[in-house]
Amino acid sequence: MRFVRYSLDGSAGRGVVVDDLVHECSGGNGGPGRVVGRLAELALLSPCDPRTIVCAGSNYAGQIAEKGRPWPERPPLFLKSHNAVTGPDSVILRPSEVRRLEYEGELAVVIGRTARDVPADRAADFVLGYTCANDVTAHDWRDDGQWTRAKSADTFCPMGPWIETDIADPSALRITTRLGGRVVQEESTSDMVFGIGELLAFVTRWITLEPGDVLLTGSPAGVGPMVPGDIVEVEISGIGTLRNTVADRG
C-alpha cells in the first residue's frame, strides 16, 4: 500500500494510492475511501509529518571507505528538526551564508506504532513503511561544528513521494541519487553497517519514537555539492523517486 499526504483547497489530507488515483484514508485502518483526484494532478506533501527525525551517520561501507573513516562501533546519531521537512517537487533553499550545499540520498523508515526498547528482531513490527529522503547538509556549517544548523535549516529534509508499506526486504533495496540526470550515488541497502533492526533497537533504548516519526538510515558513497538550478533525484527500488530543485533562499 502507498500512503500520501496532499494539499487540496488550502488543506492537507492523507490518502491511499490505488492505481493512478488517490483515495481519502478512511476508517481506523486507513483504507481507501472516496477518490480525491489523480495522483499526477495533486500537489504532494511530505508523506509524513514527524515529531522526531533521528539520523544515522557513517552507515554505508562505501562511504566509510571513500572518506577513510574508522568503522563505527555504535551507530553515530544526530537529529534533524521538524521544520526541515519538505515534500516531493518542492524547492530546497540554500541559505545565503552557505557556500557548499550537499545532497545525501537515504532510505527513510517511517514508524507505525510507539517504539520504546524495541528488540532488533522485532523492528518490523514497529515500522509503517519506507520512503525516499535527502539529508541535505550545509557542508561549511557542519565543518565548523554547528551540526544542528547544518542539518536542520528549512527545507533540509525532503521526503517522498509516498510511504511504501509493501517492502519484503528493506536490506535489499537500491539507492540511486541523480544530479541533473547524472548518477552520483548508487549502492545497496545491504551495505549498511547497522541494519534497520540494529538502528531502531539502539535509538529506542533512549528515545521513544511515535507513529509518523522517521529514522534516516545513512547515505551511500558519492555525497557531493548541489547548486541553485540543480534538479536532484533520490530513487529507491520498490519505492519511487523523490525529486527536488535547488534555489537560493535570498
Identify the role of each PLM range.
Residues 2-96, 103:
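Extended, compositionally biased flexible segments
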Residues 116-130:
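N-terminal accessory regions of nucleic-acid-interacting proteins
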Residues 26, 35, 43-47, 63, ...:
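Catalytic-pocket segment enriched in acidic/His residues
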Residues 55, 102-104, 210, 227-228:
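Residue-level recognition of short, solvent-exposed, well-ordered loop/turn junctions
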Residues 97-101, 151-154:
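Short Gly/Pro-enriched turn/cap motifs at secondary-structure boundaries
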Residues 76-94, 116, 155-160, 216, ...:
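Short catalytic-site patches enriched in acidic/histidine residues
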Residues 80, 105-107, 111-113, 131-136, ...:
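Short, structured patches in soluble enzyme cores that scaffold and shape functional sites
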